[in-house]
Curated annotation (Swiss-Prot):
Name recorded for this polypeptide: Zinc-responsive transcriptional regulator ZAP1
Induction conditions: Induced by zinc. Regulates transcription of its own promoter in response to zinc through a positive autoregulatory mechanism.
Location of the region described as Transcription activation domain 1 (AD1) in the Swiss-Prot/TrEMBL record: 207-402
Function: Transcription regulator controlling zinc-responsive gene expression. Binds to zinc-responsive elements (ZREs) (consensus sequence 5'-ACCYYNAAGGT-3') in the promoter of target genes. Recruits SWI/SNF, SAGA, and Mediator complexes as coactivators in a zinc-responsive manner. Involved in zinc ion homeostasis by zinc-responsive transcriptional regulation of the zinc uptake system genes ZTR1 and ZTR2. Positively regulates ETR1 expression, affecting mitochondrial function.
Encoding gene, per UniProt annotation: ZAP1
DNA-binding residues: 705-846
Compartment(s) of residence: Nucleus
Length: 880
């Protein structure tokens, strides 16, 4: 993904503060309730671009004259304790019901990002210093002239400098880094002085390779230098803003005024090459329009014609069938499908937008257009939240590199590739659960059978990475291909290195070959002789003709998307840490719903459930959920007690017979795939279909298992033989305490029988299978508890409050809330607890005496605490 390119050239408001003030004056009670609402949107992965867009809804009282409030509004306000408990809660991967929530919000704002893959022609607007060093002085030629937002016509030629300035500032937000930013760069690193957040998105799209990449793929193993150059990511600098007021002129509209997408009325002031690029944006016809509860006005839309091309209609059919974001069905008004207007109305705030004061009748249309303002504070906040959501699933939940052996190796401090994930990518992103068409497990024993024709494209599962920096770009660190700083070689950049710096063809994919053992990446950048040159002569501020030679003769449109992702989450922010954690006797309070979920996963799940293949019970107040593994308990916390983040894919191919299911993609990224594989080894049905287009071989149990007990290293043919060996040889009797000597374990148990049960975690021996879902378990007791999740049986009843539970231990802990019994005591301070997990967490507070009041993390060093407080302050930016 090279550079962020504006989908439109919209009218800009003075600032987000102005918009916020307008909304506050229009609805004074709306913003006093608290900052809460819903974010939902799409990620469209095309062959040559990724388009991310969506809506943000703030909770606000709905006028009785326009619509009636729904009972679900109370559930949104109480999202901290039970996210959308009024029938709208759902498991990840289940049907989303955001359509029921969108009706509750009259405040709707639009966000969008457009990222191109491997388009060198889009990188020439990236660097202001580079332009000025070439004596173009763009900053002096561009003038920010306020335009009348009510005027439907503007002088297109005179407005061109300002439009060009908008493109320039929009593109400046995304800069391709000249060198890879390491996940943990050392102090004084020339790459960046901060540690950027990493957003990693899975992708199975086919990205055409250049001839240089094809030749490189046929060559020998690349050098370390090639690997380092391969690490160029998209770097987003949040301190660069587009503050220019734009005229009421929209390039996108210039190419949507025809009855089809094949013919365009080009503006004479824009060259054909750039016109082709902008016209192709009309191929993305997903408006993601929320039908607000307004009175329909047919007169407002009587002059519009609706058009749909073949490609967009296919995408919309899938969208309407599997996505509920934009559909709203009521008794009085049928569901409105996606409509693509032949021409848009003037770029004014929609009648139901937060940027316009609502009237008593809220006259409007069913397809009120949202203001398309790119790269605002809210846009960057949304992208930052995606990174923060990704960080929720770091180790121990997201051992992303180890378990499926991506070829996305991390880089060490010296820039060389490492073979593990300790210094590499440390995040597991929930977006990875959304895209299909990838193997559930690597075939490490296969051979490389690629033909010459297959090397021109890469169909393998790979990742796109986005680096999120909270500062301005450090231009002193821009280094050209010869290793010379760009800040000190202005003349050389003007004549020679400018082509290298700007016209370089960047590649941000991480390719992985499924048919051969893990190896170093084979994709490199183009050589200098293959790069397209950019003219170095002076350009007039209103003339694009001199750029025509530098643009490709034909820019391919975004075609045949196979990865349309739907995502949503809810947010809630409180100033006084009013969101209480209701985990058993947890005294913590959080300022936002995101912080609450982060606290639950990091301070409770990671500490209470250190053995993810054992049954896990949720310890939230009045919650009796029993999970099968770490995946289930994490998803339960997300849906019922957290931000309710959900992500689904609306892929036409994914719903065809023989396509790879979402469960298979889950196996690719699951930190404990063994929990899903044992059932297959014991005869459970295989998810792989005989008609599978990818011809994935069935997952097989390892031929031999090795005993790792205190250096034993004996091999066995099955998990049962290993388990019998452990019980017969290594477990003695008659001890007062038993210790597990398995590699890196060393847990102690008061009874031998408990150690025997624990050993099955290491041996993977699970002889008990559920007849309903074919899952396997290590003990009969665990199987009985699991079957109650299917039957709904709760045989254990509290004799005081008559509450029922599925397992006896949950009832035992619950009764302590009535009796006040706290049998567990801290040996350091004497504080008592009613549950062992709370005691374990409390003991850690003695080991780390410095505690952050924002995120509840503890540290043993005061300097680390101060650094964490600064980080928390940056992450707690408001949406407005």
């Amino acid at each position: 993904m090279d550079a962020l390119t504006p989908r439109d050239s919209p009218k800009r408001d003075d600032s987000m503060a102005t918009s916020a003030a307008t909304a506050a004056s229009a609805k004074p009670d709306a913003l006093t309730i608290g900052k809460e609402g819903i974010v939902h949107g799409h990620i469209h992965n095309y062959n040559n671009l990724t388009y991310i867009h969506g809506h943000l809804h703030h909770s606000a009282p709905v006028n009785d004259s326009s619509a009636s409030a729904t009972p679900a509004a109370a559930a949104v306000a109480d999202a901290a304790t039970s996210a959308f408990a009024s029938g709208a809660s759902h498991d990840m991967g289940g049907d989303c019901h955001v359509n029921e929530k969108c009706k509750e919000y009259t405040d709707c704002q639009h966000f969008e990002f457009l990222n191109y893959h491997n388009n060198p022609s889009l990188t020439k607007y990236n660097d202001t210093a580079t332009y000025n060093s070439n004596n173009h002085s763009f900053a002096n030629n561009f003038h920010s002239v306020a335009s009348d937002p009510t005027s439907p016509q503007q002088n297109s030629k005179s407005d061109l400098p300002r439009r060009k300035d908008s493109w320039f500032n929009d593109d400046l937000i995304l800069l391709p880094s000249s060198k890879k930013n390491k996940p943990n760069p050392p102090p004084g690193s020339d790459d960046c002085y901060c540690t950027p957040k990493i957003l990693e998105i899975c992708c199975d799209e086919t990205h055409p390779k250049s001839e240089a990449n094809i030749k490189q793929g046929e060559s020998d193993q690349p050098t370390k230098k090639d690997i380092s150059e391969n690490g160029n990511d998209v770097a987003i600098f949040t301190d660069v803003k587009n503050d220019h007021l734009m005229p009421n002129f929209n390039l996108h509209d210039q190419y949507c005024n025809s009855t089809n997408h094949d013919s365009h009325n080009h503006n004479n002031t824009v060259p054909d090459s750039f016109s082709q690029l902008m016209s192709h944006l009309s191929e993305i016809d997903c408006d993601l329009t929320c039908d607000t509860p307004c009175t329909a006005s047919t007169s407002a839309t009587s002059g519009h014609k609706f058009v749909q091309d073949h490609q967009s209609s296919n995408n919309d059919d899938v969208f309407h069938k599997y996505c509920k974001f934009c559909e709203e069905s009521t008794d009085n008004q049928p569901c409105s499908k996606h409509m693509h207007l032949e021409s848009k109305p003037p770029q004014l705030p929609p009648k139901c937008s937060s940027l316009r004061k609502p009237t008593n009748t809220l006259q409007g249309t069913n397809h009120a257009y949202h203001e398309h303002i790119l790269n605002t504070d809210m846009d960057l906040k949304i992208l930052e939240d995606l990174c923060n959501i990704s960080s929720l699933y770091e180790v121990p939940f997201g051992k992303h590199i180890n378990h499926h052996d991506h070829n996305n190796a991390g880089n060490g401090c010296d820039g060389s590739s490492t073979g593990n994930n300790e210094n590499g990518n440390q995040t597991m992103n929930l977006l990875l659960s959304s895209i299909n068409r990838c193997n559930p497990k690597n075939n490490l024993n296969g051979s490389n059978n690629n033909t010459a024709g297959a090397t021109s494209t890469d169909h393998q599962h790979h990742h796109h990475r986005i680096q999120f920096h909270s500062h301005k770009p450090n231009r002193n660190n821009i280094v050209n291909n010869s290793g010379i700083s760009a800040a000190n070689t202005t003349a050389d950049l003007t004549n020679n290195d400018l082509n290298d710096l700007i016209s370089r063809e960047y590649s941000y994919e991480r390719f992985r070959n499924q048919s051969e053992p893990p190896s170093l990446p084979k994709v490199t950048h183009q050589n200098q002789k293959n790069r397209r040159s950019w003219p170095t002569k002076d350009l007039e501020s209103t003339d694009f003709s001199s750029l025509e030679d530098s643009l490709p003769s034909s820019i391919s449109p975004p075609i045949q998307t196979t990865s349309t992702i739907n995502f949503n989450w809810c947010f809630k922010e409180e100033k006084n840490n009013d969101l209480k954690c209701k985990w058993k006797e947890c005294p913590e309070s959080c300022s936002s719903l995101f912080d609450l979920q982060r606290h639950l996963l990091k301070d409770h799940v990671s500490q209470d459930f250190k053995h993810p293949m054992e049954p896990l019970a949720c310890n939230w107040e009045d919650c009796d959920f029993l999970g099968d593994d770490t995946c289930s308990i994490v998803n339960h916390i997300n849906c019922q007690h957290g931000i309710n983040f959900d992500i689904q894919f609306a892929n036409p191919d994914s719903f065809l017979p023989g396509s790879i299911s979402k469960e298979k993609h889950h196996l690719l990224h699951c930190p404990n795939p063994q929990t899903h594989e044992v059932s297959k080894a014991d005869g459970a049905p295989d998810m792989t279909s005989a008609n599978d287009v990818s011809n994935i071989p069935p997952i097989k149990q390892p031929e031999q298992v090795i005993c790792q007990w205190d250096g034993c290293n004996k091999s066995f043919s099955s998990a049962q033989e290993l388990n019998d060996h452990l019980e017969a040889v290594h477990l003695t009797r008659g001890k007062s305490e038993y210790q597990c000597l398995w590699h890196d374990c060393h847990r102690t148990f008061p009874q031998r029988q408990k150690l025997i049960r624990h050993l099955k975690v290491h041996s993977k021996y699970k002889p008990y299978k559920c007849k309903t879902c074919k899952r396997c378990f290590s003990s009969e007791e665990t199987l009985v508890q699991h079957t109650r999740t299917h039957s709904g049986e709760k045989p254990y009843k509290c004799h005081i409050c008559n509450k029922k539970f599925a397992i006896s231990s949950s009832l035992k802990i619950h009764i302590r809330t009535h009796t006040g019994e706290k049998p567990l005591q801290c040996k350091i301070c004497g504080k008592r607890f009613n549950e062992s997990s709370n005691l374990s967490k409390h003991i850690k507070t003695h080991q780390k005496k410095y505690k952050c009041s924002d995120c509840s993390k503890s540290f043993d060093d005061l300097g680390k605490l101060n650094s964490q407080k600064v980080k928390c302050a940056l992450e707690r930016k408001p949406y407005l």
